[in-house]
Amino acid sequence: MQASQTIITVETIVAAPVDKVWQYFTLPEHIINWNNASADWHTPKAENDLRPGGKFTSRMEAKNGSFGFDFSGVYDVVEVHKAIDYTLGDDRKVKIQFLEEGGNTKLTEQFEAEETNPVEMQQTGWQAILNNFKTYVETH
């Protein structure tokens, strides 16, 4: 991550062991069920080649069909049950850490802010997705 770039951090504690959290975070059949910031959005398709140099794409769309985009990038670091670093298509960096704490897993994401939307909006959106992830893991 670049020192001059604004870094946003979001995190949650999931009431599940790290191996379950890792699977639900990385397998496309789970990603499509939690990867949305609000109930009026969804991810109808996800692809994930989880290895350094591997690519991922999640198709994110408004349920009413009014807007959609591909959230995609390339993995830089993959340390099973510990860390995932990737570079987005616009060259921003993202770092994700998984830390098991007494049967729970602390999941922390740090990402470089983009220039278009306010920092608060970006943080709120990414946190909402992480909150959906927590709920999905804990109820499945």
Predicted feature locations:
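Short, surface-exposed coil-to-beta transition loops
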Residues: 7-9, 68-72, 91-95
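Generic structural detector for well-ordered beta-strands
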Residues: 9-15, 49, 59, 74, ...
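A short, structured loop/turn motif at beta-sheet edges
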Residues: 18-19, 50-51, 76-81, 97-106
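Glycine-rich portal/gate segments that line the openings of hydrophobic small-molecule binding cavities
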Residues: 42-85
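Hydrophobic ligand-binding cavity/cleft-lining segments
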Residues: 1-41
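Short, highly charged C-terminal tails/helix-capping segments
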Residues: 136-140
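Hydrophobic pocket/interface hotspot
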Residues: 21-22, 31, 56-58, 75, ...
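Beta-strand/loop substructures that line and gate deep hydrophobic ligand-binding cavities in soluble
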Residues: 83-128, 133
